[in-house]
Amino acid sequence: MKLVLFLNMGGATNLQDCEVFLKNMFNDPYILGIKNRFLRKFVAWIITKARVKAMQENYKKMGGKSPLNELTQSLCDKLNLKQDEFKFDFVNLYVPPFATEILQKYTLNASDEIILFPLYPHHSCTTVTSSLEVLQNEISKQKIQAKVKTIDIFYKNELYNEMIVSHILAKKSKFDAKILIFSAHSLPQSIIDKGDLYEKHVNDHVEILKEKLKDHFDEFILAYQSKLGPVKWLEPNTSDVLANLNDKALIYPISFCIDCSETIFELGMEYKHLSKYNYDLISCPNDSDEFMEFILKYLSDLN
């Protein structure tokens, strides 16, 4: 068996899971860099209690749940129907399904392979490193003897970028805008200053896409969303960019592979009132045929 596990932070599937998500996220040492585990747990509890009601209110506007789990499950189901070389499943970091329960579903031996596939095109310790570490620790804990392969970044992949360009131009054919905003999830500047490669990878990716799209847009803007708290984060903020738009625009959520609250609610709903001009949101790759084609080709090349 070649078991491919997509890794992601996950999205709450009900309002009660909002607290679970926040608690686990802020207990992650890669997210909240407090070395003392007990102090980190206490601070995480305070942050969770302060934020959970607002998060639940936001989720109510999306129908009470994030679309991330359903879309990822659909992606796995479609891939499993499409071929029989790989078995696809997914693991979340902060809400179910967790690594423990997913790995226990399968009987794996030394002749099998586990391919860990974080659904993040750019590397960051807060996403890729954290996810891989949790999975590798659980594999070791369960004494699974299968060979483990890991996939890191894929933002330079030609097929992946052709897919993005195709999705952007398809949306542009219905909503003709001359400005394209690439919105990436922000990170605290302190994490970047410690050597995290995320900002560099995002900048590199934007340059690749700008070159491919230069004949279709007059202006490209990279902005960062989802800032939390008073510390310095990567800039400019997507909300500020939208507030200062001088024409209609398209937004592509460049750091996301699957639509989630940050895309559907934050970009699609919360920021709508900020701009004097209309903007339209381009969907993430999700469970599209083009994304499946990229995944299967990437895995084939890996082997």
From Swiss-Prot:
GO biological process: heme biosynthetic process
Enzyme Commission number(s): 4.98.1.1
Location relative to the cell: Cytoplasm
Reactions that this protein is recorded to catalyse: heme b + 2 H(+) = protoporphyrin IX + Fe(2+)
Binding site for Fe cation: H185, E262
GO cellular component, one term: cytoplasm
Single GO molecular function: ferrochelatase activity
PROSITE patterns the UniProt entry points to: FERROCHELATASE
Pathway: Porphyrin-containing compound metabolism; protoheme biosynthesis; protoheme from protoporphyrin-IX: step 1/1
Keywords (A to Z) from UniProt: Cytoplasm, Heme biosynthesis, Iron, Lyase, Metal-binding, Porphyrin biosynthesis
Broad class of the protein's primary localization: cytoplasm
One Pfam family named in its UniProt record: Ferrochelatase
InterPro entries membership: Ferrochelatase, Ferrochelatase_AS, Ferrochelatase_C, Ferrochelatase_N
The protein's role, per its UniProt record: Catalyzes the ferrous insertion into protoporphyrin IX.
Family under the similarity heading: Belongs to the ferrochelatase family.
NCBIfam families attached to this UniProt entry: hemH
Name assigned to this protein: Ferrochelatase
Species of origin: Campylobacter jejuni subsp. jejuni serotype O:2 (strain ATCC 700819 / NCTC 11168)
